């Protein structure tokens, strides 16, 4: 079971070490990082590297590039949520610290993140996601997916701006024994962290069916 990057790792296990997985649950993920996703994550890494405290990655752990990492998180967070949610929650309302409430919210998310994450780790994870492409060693993405034999559940979140419904439908279309569920949500990609009841119901049904068919 893997959401986002975890889903990418689950796909790789299914392809490279198939005996490790009896079934797959791929949540808000993709077979290949898109050009748009690569562009966004590249800007996030640039924000970190432009921080004077980055020091080419050789910063002291007590003085990491906080401003750059906070900005990277803000850039990422825009892709994690949807315009529908932002409009309903913030619209063009005035902020307390900035001109607009949405700016205050993004600043809060950035500051919260730097208290629990390391900049170099963030860069490495970002590069890992950019390199994700299951077609490596196969003639195409489709042929790679067709080689996956495990029962598979693909879960998409409505309004996911990071990994589109089309990308996730491709997984379900070409994996031979796959089913696809779409969770209605205004929270976009982060819906898998928020729509816990819907997620739980879908997972419970899939795992029960697998147990009954074993």
Residues of each region from the PLM?
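Conserved alpha/beta-hydrolase "nucleophile elbow" surrounding the catalytic nucleophile
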Residues: 2-3, 157
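Short glycine-enriched nucleophile-adjacent loop
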Residues: 7-18, 24
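Alpha/beta-hydrolase-fold enzymes
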Residues: 20-22, 26-112
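Active-site nucleophile elbow and catalytic-triad environment of alpha/beta-hydrolase enzymes
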Residues: 108-109, 124-144
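Acidic catalytic loop of the alpha/beta-hydrolase fold
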Residues: 112, 131-133, 158-163
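Short alpha-helix in the alpha/beta-hydrolase fold that links the catalytic acid
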Residues: 137-142, 150-151, 161-173
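Short beta-strand/loop motif that positions the catalytic acidic residue
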Residues: 148, 154-156
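Catalytic active-site module of serine/aspartate enzymes centered on a nucleophile-bearing elbow/loop
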Residues: 169-170, 177-214
